[in-house]
């Protein structure tokens, strides 16, 4: 299983990686500070889970999620955001993510999202 974590904040990115490693110790967890680098990786190697920041105001995370969904329609997407739930709800829900977290999410909440993915991972 490959989990791709994307956040432009190094501390948050490290936290996402640590929690992904806890949830799936056997997974290949890749980290990226930009949507562009993450997309380059996914185009070459694919991924099963995309754990990404929405990243206003440019909404790079939504753009990335749309592109990754075209590559793998059954990719599990978990959005992480500083936004309130309503700010980007329509755009987020159109992508049918596996989860949605705020940046204040606890390790337990992140683990719960990773353990309740929409699409099963082999």
Name the predicted role of every residue range.
Residues 63, 84-99:
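Alpha4 helix (beta4-alpha4-beta5 surface) of REC/receiver domains from two-component response regulators
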Residues 105-115:
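C-terminal output helix
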Residues 31-49:
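Acidic, metal-coordinating helix/loop segments flanking the phosphotransfer/catalytic sites
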Residues 34, 60-63:
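Acidic catalytic/metal-coordinating carboxylates
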Residues 1-11, 16-17, 50:
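Conserved acidic segment of CheY-like receiver
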Residues 10-30:
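Two-component/phosphorelay signaling modules centered on CheY-like receiver
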Residues 54-55:
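The short loop immediately C-terminal to the conserved phospho-acceptor aspartate in CheY-like receiver
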